[in-house]
Amino acid sequence: MEADNTTETDWLNITYITMEAAIGLCAVVGNMLVIWVVKLNPTLRTTTVYFIVSLALADIAVGVLVIPLAIAVSLQVKMHFYACLFMSCVLLIFTHASIMSLLAIAVHRYLRVKLTVRYRTVTTQRRIWLFLGLCWLVSFLVGLTPMFGWNRKATLASSQNSSTLLCHFRSVVSLDYMVFFSFITWILVPLVVMCIIYLDIFYIIRNKLSQNLTGFRETRAFYGREFKTAKSLFLVLFLFALCWLPLSIINFVSYFDVKIPDVAMCLGILLSHANSMMNPIVYACKIKKFKETYFLILRAVRLCQTSDSLDSNMEQTTE
């Protein structure tokens, strides 16, 4: 019976690690493509794209840092308490960087439709950089809070003398912190605020489009574009909520000493990380300029491959 449990655990770990690696690769490639698209297409270099790039950087960090660390933590390697805690905090930083970038995007789109006349004077480039810097600062402070004392060090000290342990997220991070501070304060509340902002955006746009704007074709076109952009960005927000809420609910339920199956926990973690590879797909499907530039890049890559193939064939023929 014990051997069966060990085999089952091994298969779960192998499946989890394989899927994490695939998600990480897709997240890095997809979001690097987003940044490449912005670099190649000057028409995409709008103020909103600064925030989209910030979100892409957070998602790249998930693929490069968070997923490898999550795999290391899942293997329960023996290490010092604070080394394990720091690794766990890094996982949290980029979660909050994503949510703060989404909040920044929502606020920016709201200002765009609400302050149409004063928009350019209010949203200067300097203010946008300051806002982005504030978002990342908050993300680091919230994510690193357990390092300043809100952790399970005292609980573990009373039950074991050694400062080393088998590293596991829940062994070092307090569920009080996860549920009340990380989830409710810095994930759930921003999600509710963003939903209210987007509802107001759609309400403003609908009112403007329903008004008799005959002779104001440019104004109608502006609000039509804003409506399409808002729908696309709201889909990004919806996917974030869909991917992160299951894991947050699992943590919330665990707070009341309910036993969660390992499979459910792994699925929750995988789903949360999978969100990092979804945004490039949304941009490709929903934002025309992104889609067009994606196709240009793919065409250029195919032409390069064809050219390389022709060169190698020519060399073989010459020989």
Swiss-Prot record:
Glycans are attached at N5, N13, N161. Disulfide bonds join C84-C167. GO terms for molecular function: G protein-coupled adenosine receptor activity. Residues 1-15, 74-85, 150-178, 257-262 are extracellular. The chain crosses the membrane at residues 16-38, 50-73, 86-107, 128-149, 179-199, 233-256, 263-285. It is a multi-pass membrane protein. InterPro entries: Adeno_A3_rcpt (IPR000466), Adenosn_rcpt (IPR001634), GPCR_Rhodpsn (IPR000276), GPCR_Rhodpsn_7TM (IPR017452). GO terms for cellular component: neuromuscular junction; plasma membrane; synapse. PROSITE patterns: G_PROTEIN_RECEP_F1_1, G_PROTEIN_RECEP_F1_2. It comes from the Eukaryota. SUPFAM superfamilies: Family A G protein-coupled receptor-like (SSF81321). Keywords: Cell membrane, Disulfide bond, G-protein coupled receptor, Glycoprotein, Lipoprotein, Membrane, Palmitate, Phosphoprotein, Receptor, Transducer, Transmembrane, Transmembrane helix. A lipid is attached at C304 (S-palmitoyl cysteine). One of its GO terms (biological process) is G protein-coupled adenosine receptor signaling pathway. Residues 39-49, 108-127, 200-232, 286-319 are cytoplasmic. It is found in: Cell membrane. Phosphorylation on Thr-317 and Thr-318 may be crucial for rapid desensitization. Phosphorylation on Thr-317 may be necessary for phosphorylation on Thr-318 to occur. Belongs to the G-protein coupled receptor 1 family. Receptor for adenosine. The activity of this receptor is mediated by G proteins which inhibits adenylyl cyclase. This is Adenosine receptor A3. It comes from Mus musculus. The gene is Adora3.
